[in-house]
């Protein structure tokens, strides 16, 4: 999901 991708680059 969108948030998933965001957490991936975290």
From Swiss-Prot:
Q: Name one GO cellular component term.
A: extracellular region
Q: Which InterPro entries has this protein been placed in?
A: Tachy_Neuro_lke_CS
Q: Which residues form a coiled coil?
A: none
Q: Does the keyword Magnesium apply?
A: no
The domain of life is Eukaryota
Where Methionine amide occurs along the chain? 10
Record PROSITE patterns: TACHYKININ (PS00267)
| Major subcellular location class | secreted
Q: What's a GO biological-process term for it?
A: neuropeptide signaling pathway
Q: Which UniProt keywords apply?
A: Amidation, Neuropeptide, Secreted
Give the UniProt subcellular location, in the record's own words: Secreted
Could you tell me what this protein does? Answer: Tachykinins are active peptides which excite neurons, evoke behavioral responses, are potent vasodilators and secretagogues, and contract (directly or indirectly) many smooth muscles.
| Family, as annotated | Belongs to the tachykinin family.
Q: What is this protein called?
A: Neurokinin-A
The organism's lineage is: Eukaryota, Metazoa, Chordata, Craniata, Vertebrata
């Amino acid at each position: 999901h969108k948030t998933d991708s965001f957490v991936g680059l975290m």
